[in-house]
Structure formats: structure tokens, C-alpha cells
Amino acid sequence: MSRGTGAGYDRHITIFSPEGRLYQVEYAFKAVKSAGVTSIGVRGKDSVCVVTQKKVPDKLLDHTSVTHLFPITKYIGLLATGLTADARSLVYQARNEAAEFRFKWGYEMPVDVLAKWIADKAQVYTQHAYMRPLGVVAMVLGYDEEKNAQLFKCDPAGHFFGHKATSAGLKEQEAINFLEKKMKDDPQFSYEETVQIAISALQSVLQEDFKATEIEVGVVRKDDRVFRALTTEEIDQHLTAISERD
């Protein structure tokens, strides 16, 4: 096999190929897409919303135990797209880090600080052979007193950026194309508009009309700054509003 085909280089996390690629990191991104789920995040004027598909792989599973939404603190939420087991490991560590921050400094960990910590952790995994990169893209959301609504996306390569709107997973690029059109004039969405834009973006790229039990929606609002997942009844109300508007 020729030197440039990647033979051998895909077996090591820490070695660049002659083309300057880290194959194991690229495979981690493929693992995120292979989960077959698409997620959307939208930041409004005074709220943030994330929405993802809720796929229950087995009819005998209790669907209430299947989730991609995780509270890190009372005020910060995380939406994980990719391998659920990797996500739980990341969430456990993030909760521990946030608790230590609260204990040490006496105030809640800011959203951007947590996002940077997650990204730093992911970047270290690309440098050491004893750990593989996590097959997870994490959207971190919260409301900051100084910076208002915050939405960050952290990926297996260690990147993290703040976003007005973003997507992860199988139909990521299609969703980003849809969101770019909606966010073109930098609209200041109300809470209801933020939630409904996120849901309608997911419906549009997947060309499906969802039932309330088929998606998960997580929100943070300026009013109380608490992260929570919407109930099935609340999701149903937004789905009805979207169908009536369309």
C-alpha cells in the first residue's frame, strides 16, 4: 500500500498522516453521524433552545429512560449527539468539574468556561494514546448575567465556538443551510419563536412531522435561568403552533 493512503496512520491517535490528518479524530466525527440522530440549537433574544430526535431502538424499552439532554448544573444544560455511553462519561466529568468550581469560587460556573473545559478535555484526548477521542458533539447552553443567552458547540477535535444557531449529527450541513437563511438578518427571537424555529428546522431537514414523543427539547430562559426539558404537552403545543402557522 502506498505511503499516502493512510495505512498504519489510522491505528494511532497521536500520529499525523503525510497529508496532515488525524484519522482517529476523523473517525470520531463519523461516529457522531453514525448514531443517525440530528440535533439543532438556536439562541434567541432572551432564551436558548436545543432540540434533537428521540429514537427508541427497542419496543420493550421504557422511552422515558432514553435521553440526550443532561443538566450539568441547575442553570447549564448539555445536549449530546453521538455515542450515548461516551456522552454519559463526559456529563459525569462535567458535573464534577462544575461542582468543584462552585465549591472553590462560590458562584456558578459560567457557560463559556464549562464549554472551554469540555473542549480542552477533548483536545487532550487527541494527543495521548491511552485515551481515544469521545464520539460526541456537545451543545452547551445557559443564560449568563453578563453575556445573556449562550450556546456553544464542542466537538471531538477540541474546537468550541459560540453560536447564534448550530446543528450536529447526520443532517448537520442541511440544517445549517436552513438556519443560515433564518438567521440572516440577525433576528431577535422571542422564547416561543426560538423553540419553534429549532423544531421546524429539524422537521424541515428530515422532512418529517414529528409527534411530541419523537423529539426532545431543552430550554433556558432569562426569567429564571434554569435549564429544563419541555414536557410532552409543551412540545405538542409548539408543534400545533408550527402546523397552524405553516
Swiss-Prot record:
**Which Gene3D superfamilies is this protein grouped with?**
Glutamine Phosphoribosylpyrophosphate, subunit 1, domain 1 (3.60.20.10)
The protein's organism comes out as Oryza sativa subsp. japonica (Rice)
Q: Mind telling me what this protein is named?
A: Proteasome subunit alpha type-6
Q: List, alphabetically, the NCBIfam families matched.
A: PRK03996.1
Role according to the record = The proteasome is a multicatalytic proteinase complex which is characterized by its ability to cleave peptides with Arg, Phe, Tyr, Leu, and Glu adjacent to the leaving group at neutral or slightly basic pH. The proteasome has an ATP-dependent proteolytic activity.
For this protein, the record's InterPro entries field holds: Ntn_hydrolases_N (IPR029055), Proteasome_alpha (IPR050115), Proteasome_alpha-type (IPR023332), Proteasome_asu_N (IPR000426), Proteasome_sua/b (IPR001353), Proteasome_subunit_alpha6 (IPR034642)
**Keyword line:** Cytoplasm, Nucleus, Proteasome
Question: Record keywords: Cytoplasm included?
Answer: yes
State the similarity comment: Belongs to the peptidase T1A family.
Where in or outside the cell is it found? Cytoplasm; Nucleus
The record's listing under PROSITE patterns reads: PROTEASOME_ALPHA_1, PROTEASOME_ALPHA_2
